[in-house]
Amino acid sequence: MRKILVSDYDQTFYLNDEDIEKNKKSVENFRKQENIFIFATGRSYFDFMNKAEQYKLKWDYLIINHGATILDKNNNIISNYTIDNDVIKNIKKDLEIEEAIKYFCCNLENSRTNFNDKDLTKIHAKYEKNKAEQINSLINKKYAEFVNCYFVSGNAVEIISNKTCKSNAIEEIVQIEKVNRENIFTIGDGYSDIEMIKNYNGYCMEKSVQELLKICNGKIVKSVSELIEKI
């Protein structure tokens, strides 16, 4: 039976240059057996493709911006979810952008744009840690009807439409590939990985956020290559 493996990128597939080479080799063998490998990252298209080119990465599907956009291995767009334009102005105000260390927005065409553009797929804002946690809590409480907000590494918050997440994006791919649910495996380390870890055969990295470690039920690995050996 075919299997699907979905991996986060930062602090999961990539820990260091030595680790990523082992992971690449394991994924190559995994795919040779007609299995499906998917990256599910919070990175924008531009940011991920820079790493893909640097490390010569291969995949069958790519989920970017925490699930906002899904592409196949030929970069054809399968789905794209945008933040409701009507709430962006209010979100910008509550983000207190003037206090952000840096910020940027993404849409389908651009990985670095601003609030003036419409059809944004992701908003990124970096702060001091306490401020980032405060903003993350506020956005999730006030705009839960419209968006998902994640606290990410580097003391930043990232906002996407609540119509999607990594887990939902995986489900779209499953509907295309018709793989049995028990043969779908996921691995990650951060807050935006929680749903896909809960909803599939989820594993987490040793240095995952506490909330993720709590739901992994001891299914913890040191690397993607170790997980591939297990499955």
Question: Residue ranges of each PLM-predicted region?
Answer:
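Asp-based phosphoryl-transfer active-site loop
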Residues: R2-D19, F39, I197
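Active-site metal-binding loops of divalent metal-dependent hydrolases
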Residues: Y9-Q11, R43, G188-G190
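Conserved acidic, metal-coordinating active-site core of Asp-based
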Residues: E98-Y200, K207
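Active-site phosphate-binding/coordination module
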Residues: D19-L108, R112
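Asp-based, Mg2+/Mn2+-dependent phosphohydrolase catalytic module
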Residues: N180, K198-I231
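Short, structured coil segments at secondary-structure junctions
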Residues: Y55-K58, H66, Y143, K198-Y200, ...
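Short active-site oxyanion
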Residues: E34-I38, K58-D60, R181-I184, K198-G202
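Hydrophobic beta-strand scaffold residues
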Residues: F13, F37, K102-Y103, C149, ...
